[in-house]
């Protein structure tokens, strides 16, 4: 399995494989030229990836991993689309509060063993659902490049990022209010395959939720009490990893 630290789906997949007794070789591609080369030789450009020989599957969807490995495992029960929207709203509101608490001098520093500025992590929390909404509104594929689009020059400070987050939160609400298929049963193209909108919405909710947990962890390590912690009840029903960070 190919992964890197701080990657939400990587941690979730590793925990999933371990929990179900699947032995695997762990290849951390972060700062590992040989590991990254092996990943590219498969034909993949992003992680997590589960591979057998030259065959591989992107592991953003555990259902895809189950099919690829031919595991006899029942998929988890998803929250309804409305419940996912409500959870996402809680997460975005919380992340906006946390971003405002990050000391200015820390924004360009990395967190733990991931060589990525904290400012980019904070931006990524909001970019995930923003990219989903853009893909839905423009009827285009949800690409890796769309999700990983970097922040513009105007997003430098805590307040810049927080206001950006507030804008994304409002955009999600506007999209959902006018989206005609409340069951989210239609199919959409993504960089990890073709899936129902319901499944991609679920990922667009739990993925930023996991990063919001990482922002709480960051504040804890700085000795700052997060402003209104996300609780287990707040996150109940989202298919999150057990841990907030994978070392």
Q: What residue ranges belong to the model's regions?
A:
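Local sequence-structure signature of Cys/Sec-based thiol-disulfide redox active-site neighborhoods
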Residues: 1-26
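Thioredoxin-like thiol-disulfide oxidoreductase module
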Residues: 27-45, 69
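Structural micro-motif
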Residues: 40-51, 60
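Non-catalytic, surface beta->alpha helical segment in thiol-disulfide oxidoreductase systems
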Residues: 51-77
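Short, charged, low-complexity loops and linkers
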Residues: 71-84, 153, 160
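Alpha-helical bundle segments that constitute or directly flank the non-heme di-iron/ferroxidase center
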Residues: 78-102, 123-134
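Acidic/histidine-rich alpha-helical segments that form the ligand environment
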Residues: 88-98, 153-191, 195-214
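Short, contiguous alpha-helical
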Residues: 106-151, 189-247
